[in-house]
Regions:
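Adenine nucleotide-associated cytosolic modules
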Residues: 1-268
Length: 268
C-alpha cells in the first residue's frame, strides 16, 4: 500500500524496525483485533493497539464506567463516569488515532453470541476478570479457528498466554488451549475477584502492554510466539518466569478424544 505523509510520520518508529518495516505496518493497518473487556487489561491493550495502527478494533463490554474503575482503567476518564465503557473507549481511541475503526459491542459475550462476535476478527485478546468468560472465549476461539492472546491479573500477580491449538504442524502436533492448563473453572467464589482482593493499577498497565506486544507479534508473524509458554509475573517480587506448557492429550476440547463439541455447556 502507499502511505500518506502523515502515516509515514505517525508510524516512522515501526517502519524503522527491520522486523516490521512498511510491509508490516501495512499489515497492521489491514488487521482486525477483538478485545474482550475494556477494563484494567483491556485499557492499555486498546491504547497501544490503536497507537500501533491496527486498522479495526472491536471492543466487547456491557458495563458502564464507574469511579472505582479509574485507578487502573486508563482508557476511561472522570468525565466518562456513567457512560458505556465501549463508547468511552471509542472516544479515547479516536483521540489517539482517528485512522483506526472502532467497532463497539455493548453486550456481554455469551454462548449465544461468541462465535458471531469473533468471526470478523483475525486475533482475539481476552482481558476479562472471571474464569467463566475466559473458558468461553477459549472454547469459542478454538471452534472458530482464531488465535487467542489472554491475560489474567489479581493483586500483584499476573499471567499472559497465547493459544492457537487449532493450528497443527506437519506432524499433526499443536499447542495447548486454556483447558490444557486448567481443565474446568473453579467453583464460583473460590477464587476472589479484583473487586474482592484488589489489584495494583500500574501492574495492569504493564501486563496489558505485554499482551498488546504479543497481539502485534501474532499479527506481524514475528518473534517467538507465546503459544506453548506461559508468562508468570510477580509484581511484588519484580520477577517474570516463562514456563513451558504442552497440549494435554486428555483435554476435553483439543485432546485426542474431545468431549466438548460446541458452546452449549456455557449456557446458563
Amino acid at each position: 500500500m502507499t502511505f500518506t505523509e502523515a502515516q509515514i510520520k505517525r508510524y516512522a518508529r515501526h517502519i524503522l524496525l527491520q522486523e516490521v518495516g512498511g510491509e508490516g505496518q501495512a499489515k497492521l493497518l489491514r488487521s482486525r483485533v477483538l478485545v474482550v473487556g475494556a477494563g484494567g487489561l483491556g485499557s492499555p491493550l486498546l491504547l497501544y493497539l490503536a497507537a500501533a495502527g491496527v486498522g479495526t478494533l472491536g471492543v466487547v463490554d456491557d458495563d458502564v464506567v464507574d469511579l472505582s474503575n479509574l485507578q487502573r482503567q486508563i482508557v476511561h476518564s472522570t468525565a466518562a463516569i456513567g457512560s458505556p465503557k465501549v463508547e468511552s473507549a471509542k472516544r479515547t481511541l479516536a483521540g489517539i488515532n482517528p485512522e483506526v475503526t472502532v467497532r463497539t459491542h455493548q453486550t456481554r459475550i455469551g454462548p449465544e453470541n461468541a462465535l458471531d462476535l469473533i468471526a470478523g476478527y483475525d486475533v482475539v485478546a481476552d482481558g476479562t476478570d472471571n474464569f467463566a468468560t475466559r473458558f468461553l472465549v477459549n472454547d469459542a476461539c478454538y471452534f472458530a479457528g482464531k488465535t487467542l492472546v489472554s491475560a489474567a491479573i489479581l493483586r500483584f500477580d499476573a499471567q499472559v498466554y497465547t493459544f492457537k491449538a487449532h493450528l497443527a504442524d506437519e506432524r499433526g502436533d499443536h499447542g495447548p488451549c486454556y483447558r490444557c492448563l486448567f481443565r474446568e473453572a473453579p467453583p464460583e467464589g473460590q477464587i476472589p475477584t479484583c473487586a474482592e482482593a484488589g489489584v495494583l493499577g500500574a501492574l495492569c498497565g504493564m501486563v496489558g502492554s505485554l499482551q498488546a506486544t504479543e497481539v502485534l507479534k501474532e499479527l506481524l508473524g514475528i518473534g517467538a510466539s507465546l503459544s506453548g509458554s506461559l508468562i508468570v509475573c510477580d509484581g511484588l517480587g519484580a520477577t517474570f518466569r516463562k514456563i513451558k506448557v504442552k497440549a494435554d492429550p486428555g483435554c476435553p476440547l483439543c485432546g485426542e478424544a474431545p468431549s466438548i463439541a460446541d458452546l452449549s455447556r456455557h449456557a446458563a
